[in-house]
Amino acid sequence: MKRQLPTFVTFVLVLAALGLSYGAGMKKKVVAPKDFPAGRPFSAGIQVGDTLYVSGSTGADQKTGKVPERFEDEVQLCFDNIGAILKAGGYDFSNAVSVQVYLTDMTLFPRMNAVYIKNFPEPRPTRTTVGVTALAGAAHMEVTVTARK
């Protein structure tokens, strides 16, 4: 029994050290461009370790809240907004590993895709595209991104 106690204590100390080092690297850090509007009920991005989770972004102008009339301009502005969040965390589109796209009209898919491929370099991230009935404001699309260094 006396020999087992030091082994058990060593085992517990090793587990505790592993738990502390794991938890220390898992702190959440808010990532946002300097011009990200204040007072929103969500963060633009959250970095945990080397992974950045970007909130759903639309093609609305960050200052005016207006969505461009031409859909392709809305898509590009959406990716510009995402790019600003990525850049604020020291990432870019090449770091994207997963993308979720929400479209209010699936007939817009080919037009969205044409702009999408100009923004995401090869190898492109995994992607899910979902048709939805509505999004906030006048947005026709919303995109979330997970990026990793």
Residue ranges and their predicted role:
Residues 4-80, 84-89, 94-97, 103-149:
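N-terminal presequence-like segments and the immediate start of the first folded domain
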